[in-house]
Swiss-Prot record:
GO annotation, biological process: chromatin organization; double-strand break repair; mitotic G2 DNA damage checkpoint signaling; mitotic G2/M transition checkpoint; positive regulation of DNA repair; regulation of DNA repair; response to ionizing radiation
Family membership noted in the UniProt record: Belongs to the FAM175 family. Abraxas subfamily.
Chief place of localization: nucleus
Biased composition (Acidic residues): 388-399
Position of sequence motif pSXXF motif: 404-407
Name of the featured protein: BRCA1-A complex subunit Abraxas 1
GO CC annotation terms, alphabetical: BRCA1-A complex; nuclear body; nucleus
Residues annotated as domain MPN: 7-155
Length: 407
């Protein structure tokens, strides 16, 4: 994997002990490697201010367990004997980081049996990062006075076994002069006994903290409550959405009703024209006792409809604003009249050429009294509508009542 690397670290005295044990035997030897594996992320900043993070996994080999004969925990096919493996690794199963083998007078290449055995050990020990240390001593001189020891650390990657760099530490290396920040894998017996004595108060049987277990229970309870609240919130949001849709529909209906009412009001205003206040006040002033002239609606039979009468006082008292009193001048072009009335007026002019019409105001002053005039007007108004039209068109009434543009 890019950005990751593996490094093996083997102390000098462990390598010396392995070599001493192998040289004191007459055959090949094998065993297990104990230690720990740790990862470290190294961040290096370049001149371009770009971070380069690299993860380095270090396999620290600290101990070894030898097997005093070959095929002690496996057979010739590379199959692992579980019972024999438990017997060899009784209490140190979790600290196993790999296994090793000494082969005399051979090449630095893993055999097919060793590859099968390594994969089976990965399965039984549940350790995919398991490594294999191969040591191959050989004699370089004929007198057997000089020996050569080659060693290599192998690790499977993507189905193939690759060599892993192995560093043998000693007192002459500058890297080992500093303080170690990681604790050693070997712990004190007294400390372990004290921890086992009081561990029941803080740890469960599986090694987990009791407080952590309680916190996990509280977290699960909070999650359940949160789920129930989320369901209620979702339901309320759906109800609010439905109510908003209903409100929008009601607003649309209200807007339509207001538009219809506004259109109907405009039609009513057009159908009912504005009342002529001056005419109404004039009729109430000059004909106060004639309810027929005060009514806005009259039937075909000249019957007064009482609800249609105008009983409102418009407070218009100026006489000049009620009617325009000017001297009547007859003009056929301005006011055409029927042929029968025109003939009557011509006969009247021939009969009495010396008579002259007087203004209405002078005739009103020459009358004996206002009460007599009102009674005579009331008698004339009580006749039928057809008689009123004929009398208004007669020469006698024209002589008595000169015409006014207002009426």
């Amino acid at each position: 994997m890019e950005g990751e690397s593996t490094l093996g670290v083997l102390s000098g005295f462990v390598l010396g002990a392995l070599t001493f044990h192998h040289l004191n035997t007459d055959s090949d030897t094998e065993g297990f490697l104990l230690g720990e594996m740790k990862g470290e992320a190294k961040n290096s900043i370049t001149d371009s201010q770009m971070d380069n993070v690299k993860v380095v996994y270090t396999i620290d080999i600290q101990k070894y367990i030898p097997c005093y004969r070959l095929f002690s925990f496996y057979n010739s096919l590379g199959e692992v004997n579980e019972h024999a493996l438990k017997k060899v690794l009784s209490n140190v199963r979790k600290t196993v980081v790999g296994w090793y083998k000494f082969r005399r007078h051979s090449d630095q290449i893993m055999t097919f049996r060793e590859q099968l055995l390594h994969r089976n050990l990965q399965t039984h020990l549940s350790s995919p990062e398991l490594v294999f240390l191969l040591l191959t001593p050989s004699i370089t001189t004929e007198s057997c006075s000089t020996h050569c020891l080659e060693h290599a650390l192998y690790k499977p990657q993507r189905g193939l076994f690759h060599r892993v760099p192995l560093v043998v530490t000693n007192l002459g290396m500058s890297d080992q002069l500093g303080y170690k920040t990681e604790p050693a894998s070997c712990t004190s017996t007294v400390f372990s006994r004290a921890v086992r004595t009081h561990s029941s108060q803080f740890f469960n049987e599986d090694g987990s903290l009791k407080e952590v277990h309680k916190i996990n229970e509280m977290y699960a309870a909070v999650q359940e409550e949160l789920k129930s609240i989320c369901q209620k919130v979702e339901q309320s949001e759906r109800e609010v959405e439905k109510l908003l849709m209903d409100v929008n529909q009601l607003k649309e209906v209200r807007r339509t009703q207001q538009a219809r009412a506004t259109g109907a009001g405009e039609k009513n205003v057009q159908r009912n024209p504005q009342e002529n206040i001056l005419l109404c006040q004039a009729l109430r002033t000059f004909f106060p006792e004639s309810e027929v002239l005060h009514s806005c609606v009259i039937s075909l039979k000249n019957r007064h409809i009482s609800p249609s009468g105008c009983n409102v006082n418009h407070h218009v008292d100026v006489v000049d604003q009620l009617t325009l009193m000017v001297e009547y001048v007859y003009s056929p072009e301005a006011s055409p009249v029927p042929t029968a009335q025109l003939r009557k007026r011509k006969a009247l002019d021939t009969h009495d050429q010396g008579s002259v019409k007087r203004p209405r105001l002078l005739e009103t002053e020459s009358r004996p009294s206002v009460a007599a005039s009102r009674s005579r007007h009331q008698d004339k108004a009580s006749s039928s509508s057809l008689d009123i039209d004929i009398e208004m068109g007669s020469p006698e009434d024209d002589a008595d009542y000169p015409r006014s543009p207002t009426f």
